[in-house]
């Protein structure tokens, strides 16, 4: 087989032509196409019986993480056409051709942030800071859910409260489906559907709930965990993929609050 030639045509809403690295090929950006032939890749000039090989190229999907660069239902497609000639026994060239297509759907980026505050949020918190052994101090937990390119359905956030942490039953805003199971110590926020491109918009999903900690004398000098690791799950409505995001455990170290001072997190006698 002689005069092999490969054409890879790139397309899709997430295709970023500036990011293409064609490897040994020639990138025709005006046509969104990469070409390999015997000039760019000498091994394509003459292909012996049983021989095989590979070519490589790369590209990065468009940035669709913010509403400033929206890409609805991002997808990518690569159409590959291969042409060559085969010499018959009579030395007459015979044209050969083959093609393949690969399409990809790109999932949304579903994200969760979790923080604890004292002076911010919808509730008035009480108790001493730093927290004292066998005395109750309240804190406000804030969960935020954001999403990028595709609508997400069935989103849900879950976390466990330790035995020494109490649920005060104060939640905000009204209408968010958040509950606490006193038997298991689990807090569940049934977020439901999350719109595309919520970052820095009014569509960002946010919930507050209040907890109270009553440390034991055995926790003096420690920085107790108040909310265990938190997990967000949801289903990408475009790709069908199950998405997950996690946030680390929250402690009495509420340094994201402007009122926080060094030493405020450690349990005092």
Q: Model segments located where?
A:
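Intrinsic-disorder/low-complexity, polar/charged segments enriched in Ser/Thr/Lys/Arg/Asp/Glu/Gln
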Residues: 5, 33, 52-56, 99-101, ...
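Low-complexity, intrinsically disordered segments enriched in Ser/Thr together with acidic residues
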Residues: 38-75, 83-88, 142-144, 190-239
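Short, acidic/polar linear motifs in exposed loop/turn regions
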Residues: 1, 14, 63-65, 145-150, ...
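Short beta-strand elements of extracellular/lumenal beta-sandwich folds
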Residues: 1-7, 123-158
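Extracellular/luminal low-complexity Ser/Thr/Pro-rich, glycosylation-prone repeat/linker regions
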Residues: 19, 65-126, 166-172, 176, ...
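Surface-exposed coil/turn segments at beta-strand junctions on protein surfaces, enriched
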Residues: 29, 48-52, 69-73, 105-107, ...
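...the same signal can extend to comparable exposed beta-sheet modules
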Residues: 1-2, 7-24, 29-49, 54-60, ...
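A surface/secretory-pathway sequence property marking extracellular, secreted
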Residues: 2-42, 115-119, 153-197, 254-267
């Amino acid at each position: 087989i002689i005069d092999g030639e490969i054409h890879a045509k790139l397309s899709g809403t997430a295709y970023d032509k500036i990011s293409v690295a064609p490897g040994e090929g020639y990138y025709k950006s005006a046509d969104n196409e990469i070409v390999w032939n015997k000039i760019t890749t000498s091994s394509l000039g003459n292909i012996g019986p049983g021989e095989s090989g590979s070519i490589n190229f790369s590209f990065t999907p468009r940035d669709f993480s913010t509403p400033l660069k929206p890409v609805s239902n991002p997808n990518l497609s690569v159409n590959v056409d291969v042409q060559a000639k085969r010499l018959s026994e009579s030395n007459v060239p015979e044209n050969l051709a083959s093609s393949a297509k690969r399409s990809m759907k790109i999932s949304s980026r579903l994200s969760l942030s979790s923080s604890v505050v004292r002076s911010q949020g919808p509730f008035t918190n009480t108790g001493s800071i730093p927290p004292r052994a066998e005395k109750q101090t309240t804190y406000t937990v804030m969960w935020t859910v954001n999403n990028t390119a595709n609508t997400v359905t069935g989103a849900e956030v879950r976390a466990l409260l330790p035995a020494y942490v109490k649920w005060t039953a104060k939640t905000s805003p009204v209408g968010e489906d958040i509950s606490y199971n006193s038997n298991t110590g689990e807090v569940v926020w049934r977020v439901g559907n999350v719109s595309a491109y919520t970052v820095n918009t009014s569509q960002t999903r946010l919930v507050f709930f209040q907890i109270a900690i009553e440390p034991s004398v055995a926790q003096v000098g420690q920085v107790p965990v108040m909310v265990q690791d938190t997990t967000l799950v949801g289903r990408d409505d475009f790709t069908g993929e199950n998405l997950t995001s996690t946030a680390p455990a929250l402690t009495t170290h509420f340094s994201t609050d402007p009122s926080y001072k060094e030493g405020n997190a450690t349990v005092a006698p």
